[in-house]
Amino acid sequence: MLGKPARVLLFVALIVLGIGPLGSVQAQPKYVIFLIGDGMGLEQVKAAGMYAHGQPGTLSFESFDFRGELTNAPAEGGIPDSAAAGTSLATGVKVNNGVISMAIPGDGSELQTLLEYCKAQGKSTGLVSTKYVTDATPAAFGAHEPTRNNTAQIAEDFRMQTRPNVILGGGGNGMSVQAFEAAGYTVVTDRDTMQALDTENIDMVCGQFGNGPLPFEPDMGPMPHLTQMAETALRILDNDPDGFFLMVEGGQIDTAGHSNLTPNMVFETVEFDNAVQAAIAWAQGRSDTLIIVTADHETGGLSVLANNGAGELPTVSWSTGGHSEANVPVYAWGVNADMIGGVMDNTELFSVVTAGP
């Protein structure tokens, strides 16, 4: 039995190591699922909850224990675009609007993204979006370009440099079936072909659906829903015993916001929540997973004026057809989730993923 001096020394040592009662050091998450509602502000979340469940505060991720708000200005200040805000989320560094994960302002060097950080640890990686996959948000995680308009170069960055194991989203805009097949990817172009994949025995898949953003919910035709893409990505990536990083973007929330289309905005946000539910279902019972749900920026300057009950669109007003400077919500579940709270900057999420021994 330890004497009192030895017990005191052990207690101090445990605290120094971070495993005593005054704090705990967790391992880095083995699995990271990073879900981004493009253009999804606090009011978009409220509106979707009212429509889906009759009350605000009822979307799946709103039940997470840890939540906060993110500021999201670009390096030059003012209103962010998806390139600058996406880069801040992906790299933890501020850049100018339009820049994809390069130090601009600065020396123009490539900034390491969360996807690259996790890949360097031996993890599989994936990008999923309802926009075309070379659009700014997925590009920020898997490419390095001085302008978001370099879609052909972004596709080449995916294909030749970062090589995510799974890429699923809208096609065209620099994407090429033949080029990705030549680079070792199995390419699928519709929902049925995607869902027929042998997800237990395939590790390089590129879904190029159509020739631009996917259709608005709920009428997808032959194209997959966001939830179906997320579930497919999870089934492929979880074959890796070393873990994975998956970014899932509900991109069409933003498109609806730019045109002030209330029904489409609500339907897209509800489908985004369905994708979050798929992530939660996959992660249930695990102690090695981090789920982050957030947005890059708010689109439309939305205000919810009245709740009209479940199944009815709430009464809203829009103040712009562009982005706003509003803070955006952030929610976290799992490993390191307790680092989320209060008002944070979007650059801080990088360290939530990477913190740990």
Can you describe what each PLM-predicted range is?
Residues 1-10:
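Bacterial N-terminal signal peptides that target proteins for export
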Residues 9-21:
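Bacterial N-terminal signal peptides
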Residues 25, 166, 196-208, 229-251:
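Active-site regions of oxyanion-processing enzymes, predominantly non-cytosolic
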Residues 25-171, 176-198, 203, 270-273, ...:
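N-terminal catalytic scaffold of extracellular/periplasmic and nuclease hydrolases
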Residues 36, 247, 293-295:
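Generic enzyme active-site microenvironment
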Residues 107, 188-230:
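Functional beta-strand-loop-alpha-helix junction segments that form "active/interaction loops"
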Residues 136-142, 211-218, 233-234, 238-276, ...:
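Active-site His/acidic residue clusters
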Residues 261-307:
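Extended C-terminal subregions enriched in glycine
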